[in-house]
Amino acid sequence: MPKYRSHTTTHGRNMAGARALWRATGMTDDDFGKPIIAVVNSFTQFVPGHVHLRDLGKLVAEQIEASGGVAKEFNTIAVDDGIAMGHGGMLYSLPSRELIADSVEYMVNAHCADAMVCISNCDKITPGMLMASLRLNIPVIFVSGGPMEAGKTKLSDKIIKLDLVDAMIQGANPNVSDADSEQIERSACPTCGSCSGMFTANSMNCLNEALGLALPGNGSLLATHADRKQLFLDAGKHIVELTKRYYEQDDISALPRSIANKAAFENAMTLDIAMGGSTNTVLHLLAAAQEGDIDFDISDIDRLSRKVPHLCKVAPSTQKYHMEDVHRAGGVVGILGELDRAGLLNREVKNVLGLNLPQTLEAYDVMLTKDEGVKQMYSAGPAGIRTTKAFSQDCRFPSLDTDRQEGCIRTREHAYSQDGGLAVLYGNLSENGSIVKTAGVDKDSLTFRGPAKVYESQDDAVAAILGGKVVAGDVVVIRYEGPKGGPGMQEMLYPTTYLKSMGLGKSCALLTDGRFSGGTSGLSIGHASPEAASGGLIALVQDGDIIDIDIPNRAMKLDVSDAELAARREAELARGDAAWTPKARERQVSYALRAYALLATSADKGAVRDKSKLGG
């Protein structure tokens, strides 16, 4: 029988000092026999997805204590990618994931906590906490802050739905008036919560539900809706049950590595492909798998991407549907139900409730369930009132979206396309793979051939696009923006956004060893591995070189002879210590970022630390 970790600090005469300190936090004699459960919060006033979390840790803690545990809350950092976007702040976004994972490990191991409830929401916070959970392998339940309501405004006598990306595109579009741009800006992000489309934050919260580590409804139920409160209460209750299952019944199925095993990772990736999730999810799933010693790599993603159809299309790939519409159609479980009926899921997986996939679908799939309470939960809708408060409204859709032919979620037979929403491309430009969000690519751009316009920083590319130096037919190449080369693997949302605002969104391609925001759409290929700073061929591309992109055949090639490439490589190596670094880039890189770059792997490994350099 496993021993409660917390007994290390609460039992034995030699721990009198530790107990004295525990007493100073409010613990009593009765508490020293109970499990100590960390409530890992991420409240901050910097991030709309986290601004409402201040009191939600207390809500979970009260439920933990009512259920027989001792709750101890702490906070992690949280970076808002949208606010950090387009300037040097974006260098810190991906590295913050590792700091979050480390901070959770430090706090939980230093204080010998027995289990965790992770209150996450936005882009790097959920992945960082997921990495820590699989690294620590103690009982855990995730409950996120929930999605933002979609923005809505009236333009040209028509009501339109909006999100953050619309504000960015129209703000840079010279054909949009100042008044309309300001109106869109003021309407795009109306409430607290993670940005309203299938961007990285919502994608990861959906994947956590598919991994089995979050409760049904977690990925799609709006942050503002009163129904979401129950998820926090249930998380506090169930984590105590999960903890006792492991420590008192020796049930290892309660541990995250047992729940989020390889079969669950395959299901999560299958969901991601079917819903056209953010390309960042590939990076984060690969990183989490490494932390949990799970045999899941980019070849698995490639294999799955070739057979999974695109069943759910959401902003930024369309403005018709946002997360509130996914929820109305049945949320994550609704998509999983269609994937299961298509024979595309591993059915033996279990979630934190102890339910296997068929049991979960029977209870929570709106197409199957007879539970009116579940149907009511999935009818939770937006109020359209600006607010930063959680659980502040109880509006409902008049009916669920169960139209699987033309609705938000579709059957395999009526899929948006039989090709999934994500694809892995290989070729001499990305020998270890690159990622494209096919859900956001125009059908006429699935094959593309054009001359390269090469830039050694995102800033130079943005200046060229806005300055009219990029024209229709070009392949914009942005290199030395990978995990090492950036460092920090910046998101390229501004270059892709400005291509759209300049009318080039469907007539240009973009290739980078950096990554993309979940808000990116268009022919945008990222994560080129190996990256330029690691000697990848992307470092040898020159202006005017022809690049061939063939998404149906999962291929991408630099059309330059082997002899010429060998000569270019020799010339690069002749630069000595300056080889595989940008030739002309002004960028201040802090020691914190240099430390990250020193250990960072390329994107095909999840941009995690290179463990071979750490020994042990």
Swiss-Prot record:
Cofactor note from UniProt? Binds 1 [2Fe-2S] cluster per subunit. This cluster acts as a Lewis acid cofactor.
**Residue positions binding [2Fe-2S] cluster:** C122, C195
**Gene Ontology MF term list:** 2 iron, 2 sulfur cluster binding; dihydroxy-acid dehydratase activity; magnesium ion binding
Alphabetized Gene3D superfamilies for the sequence: IlvD/EDD C-terminal domain-like
Catalytic reactions on record: (2R)-2,3-dihydroxy-3-methylbutanoate = 3-methyl-2-oxobutanoate + H2O; (2R,3R)-2,3-dihydroxy-3-methylpentanoate = (S)-3-methyl-2-oxopentanoate + H2O
Stored PROSITE patterns: ILVD_EDD_1, ILVD_EDD_2
Q: Kindly report, in one word, the top-level EC class recorded for this enzyme.
A: lyase
Record text on subunit structure and interactions: Homodimer.
UniProt function note: Functions in the biosynthesis of branched-chain amino acids. Catalyzes the dehydration of (2R,3R)-2,3-dihydroxy-3-methylpentanoate (2,3-dihydroxy-3-methylvalerate) into 2-oxo-3-methylpentanoate (2-oxo-3-methylvalerate) and of (2R)-2,3-dihydroxy-3-methylbutanoate (2,3-dihydroxyisovalerate) into 2-oxo-3-methylbutanoate (2-oxoisovalerate), the penultimate precursor to L-isoleucine and L-valine, respectively.
Q: Which NCBIfam families match?
A: ilvD (TIGR00110), PRK12448.1 (NF009103)
Q: What is this protein called?
A: Dihydroxy-acid dehydratase
**Which species?**
Yersinia enterocolitica serotype O:8 / biotype 1B (strain NCTC 13174 / 8081)
